[in-house]
Amino acid sequence: MSEEFRNTYITKMSENLALLRTSINLTQERLAELIGLSRFTLIAIEKKQRTMTWNTFLSLILVFRANEKSRILMETLGIYTAEFRELLIVEDQPKKTC
């Protein structure tokens, strides 16, 4: 997966983070706790003063896709797309024989 691909999704999530968070009535403090960030870091990301990491993005996906309302909102906003969901599928690879 390319850096450009990651940055596109990170940007979409960053731009809509406060909307997604409030759509499921999470405080900044609670969301930060759920994803392992400080509240101050989360606030900086919401204010676009700090860039979100890929690991933070993936943690947010896990939180928001667990709730139907925020999952649908992520789909509508182009954050949780079919293309992205395909990346989450790990298929068994055939075992190599020596």
Predicted regions and their residues:
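Surface-exposed, interaction-prone regions with an acidic/low-complexity signature
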Residues: 1-4, 61, 66, 92-97
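A short, Lys/Arg-rich alpha-helix, primarily the initiator
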Residues: 1-23
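Short basic helix-loop element that most often maps to the first helix and adjoining turn
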Residues: 15-31, 59, 92-97
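Short alpha-helical DNA-recognition segment
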Residues: 25-44
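Short, conserved catalytic or interaction motifs in soluble domains
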Residues: 47
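DNA major-groove recognition helix of helix-turn-helix/homeodomain DNA-binding modules
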Residues: 55-76
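Short, charged recognition helix plus adjacent turn
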Residues: 69-98
